Structure formats: C-alpha cells, structure tokens
Amino acid sequence: MADKSDLNALSGRFRGYYPVVIDVETAGFNAQSDALLEIAAVTLQMNKEGWLLPDETLHFHVEPFEGANLQPEALAFNGIDPTNPLRGAVSEHDALHAIFKAVRKGIKDKGCNRAIIVAHNANFDHSFVMAAAERASLKRNPFHPFATFDTAALSGLVLGQTVLAKACLAAGIPFDSSQAHSALYDTLQTAKLFCELVNRWKKLGGWPLPTAESE
C-alpha cells in the first residue's frame, strides 16, 4: 500500500483522493430526466519523481434508460444517434459497474481513500454519473458525493481560459475540434490538461508545500 506521507505518491498529493477524469455525452442538461449516451474515464498515476500522468482508459456508449428524454438540440450538438446499432451501447448499470470496479481497484492499489471526479465543468458530469448510479442501484459508488476537481476553474486561474479547446491550446496541448464532443476524446484531452496544470504548479515550486524546516 502506498505511503500517504510520500508527497511523490498519488495518495499523498490530493489528501488521499484518487482523481479520475470523466466526460459524459448526454441527450440534455437534466441528469434526472435526460439520457446518458456516452461516458469515458481516465485514471491517473504518479511517477517516482511525482509527476502526474494518465493511466488507464475506459469508454462506453450507453443505452438511454427507459423513459429518458432525448432532446433533439443535444443530439444535433453531439452528433449521437441513440438508435444506431453500431454504437454497441451497454446499459447504464454495465457501464458504471465496470468503471466503478476499475476505480475501486485503483483506490486500493494506490493507497487512496476515495475517488474524486475530475471534469471540465465538473458539476455537469458529476450530476449525470450520480443520477445514473442511483438509477442502476449501484451501492458501492467510489466517488465523493459532491466534491470535484473542475478543470474549467483551474484553467481559468492558471491559463486565463475556461473553454476546453482554448485551455488545451494555451497549455500547449493539441486539440482537434473535429473530435470534440466525443466523450473519449474530451476525457483524454481533459486528463492531459489536468496533469499539465498539476505538474506546472509543481514546476513553479507550489508543491510540495514549504515546511518550517525548509524555511
């Protein structure tokens, strides 16, 4: 098990939280009534020098839950056809069960206490994950019920940008707008962005925190 006093360990960096980057594509803005259509998750790791890096990736197309609203404007925006059999969609239960299982393993392997969602405008993604988990009656939800790390807010502070594409470009991360609004692509880019923000703070001397002995 990782040593939480090791500031170069993932468990020592975020107060025992295990950060997992999430992006969802949906059929609207209401997590209670509108369909979850796609979800991707990227776990993170810390190397021996304490630099944050993307780790494993999970990605699922999701079947709309029974009675879900499908807002035409949202479908036109993300380009998803929920009726297309080639999507290979799975149920909310199966998608989240697989993600939660992988996240719980990561928490254990990294010596962390609980997972926390990292996302761009994180309240949106968090609300859909929580609503889908409740509908699927998944009791062992590893994510914090309300705390998140929001890369939109962090990017506004560090880069002066809040739009994902602009924040990535400002951070020197390529962003292909033609692939935007794919949960997989957006999650991968958000993971790179979050790692860059955390690592940049370390390079600038913001982490580890100064101690009385080092002053």
Curated annotation (Swiss-Prot):
Cofactor binding summary note: Binds two Mg(2+) per subunit. The active form of the enzyme binds two Mg(2+) ions in its active site. The first Mg(2+) forms only one salt bridge with the protein.
Record site feature (Important for substrate binding and specificity), residues: 29, 77, 124, 146
The keyword Magnesium is annotated on this UniProt entry: yes
Catalytic residues (UniProt): 181
Gene Ontology biological-process annotations: DNA replication proofreading; tRNA processing
Keywords: Exonuclease, Hydrolase, Magnesium, Metal-binding, Nuclease, tRNA processing
Binding, Mg(2+) 2: 23, 25, 181, 186
Catalytic EC class: hydrolase
Catalytic activity, EC: 3.1.13.-
Matching CDD domains: RNaseT
Any single GO CC term annotated in Swiss-Prot or TrEMBL for this entry: cytosol
GO MF terms held by the record: 3'-5' exonuclease activity; magnesium ion binding; nucleic acid binding; RNA exonuclease activity, producing 5'-phosphomonoesters
Cofactor: Mg(2+)
Pfam families linked to this entry: RNase_T
Residues reported in the UniProt entry to bind Mg(2+) 1: 23
Domain Exonuclease: 20-194
Subunit structure: Homodimer.
Known function: Trims short 3' overhangs of a variety of RNA species, leaving a one or two nucleotide 3' overhang. Responsible for the end-turnover of tRNA: specifically removes the terminal AMP residue from uncharged tRNA (tRNA-C-C-A). Also appears to be involved in tRNA biosynthesis.
Entries under PANTHER family matching the protein: DNA POLYMERASE III SUBUNIT EPSILON, RIBONUCLEASE T
Family designation: Belongs to the RNase T family.
HAMAP family: RNase_T
Protein's UniProt name: Ribonuclease T
Organism: Yersinia pseudotuberculosis serotype I (strain IP32953)
